[in-house]
């Protein structure tokens, strides 16, 4: 099955739909601790929970993807020798400073893996790096799921 390539765009704020902007605001409330729960955050910005969950993993303020942040990639890898090593090789070649690697016990031949790394010295952009990882044989999914300012 062919993997669908994800594309990222830099879009001017006033062109974004209100639900996407409110999702960013709700995420910022949670990050700063101004809201303790998703329910509280979405109520404060007048956004439905379903809209929040629809957009939360796909929208980030621009500064959060710039150099000097940590990024967490969640991946599903086939349980075969060398696949994780190849993923780490791509990250090392891009000069990502790896902070943590977590791998769950494989179930039905698939293992969930998260890798968190700093982007300060990153050579290349995150889109190209994740694309190269997705293209590896044995990589089923790659999703940037977390990030924070260093």
From Swiss-Prot:
Disulfide bonds: none annotated. The lineage of its organism: Bacteria, Bacillati, Bacillota, Clostridia, Eubacteriales. SUPFAM superfamilies: ACT-like. NCBIfam families: PRK04435.1. Residues 72-147 form the ACT domain. This is UPF0735 ACT domain-containing protein PTH_1602. Belongs to the UPF0735 family. It comes from the Bacteria. Signal peptide: none annotated. InterPro entries: ACT-like_dom_sf (IPR045865), ACT_dom (IPR002912), UPF0735_ACT_dom-cont (IPR008310).
């Amino acid at each position: 099955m062919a993997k669908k390539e994800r594309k990222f765009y830099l879009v001017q704020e006033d062109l974004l739909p209100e639900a996407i902007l409110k999702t960013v605001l709700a995420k910022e409330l949670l990050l700063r601790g101004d809201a303790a729960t998703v329910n509280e955050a979405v109520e404060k910005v007048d956004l439905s929970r379903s809209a929040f969950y629809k957009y939360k993993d796909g929208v980030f303020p621009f500064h959060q993807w710039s150099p000097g942040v940590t990024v967490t990639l969640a991946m599903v890898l086939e349980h075969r020798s060398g696949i994780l090593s190849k993923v780490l090789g791509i990250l090392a070649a891009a000069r990502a400073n790896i902070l943590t690697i977590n791998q769950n016990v494989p179930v039905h031949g698939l293992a969930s893996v998260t890798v968190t790394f700093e982007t300060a010295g990153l050579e290349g952009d995150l889109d190209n790096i994740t694309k190269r990882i997705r293209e590896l044989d044995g990589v089923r999914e790659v999703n940037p799921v977390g990030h924070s300012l260093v």
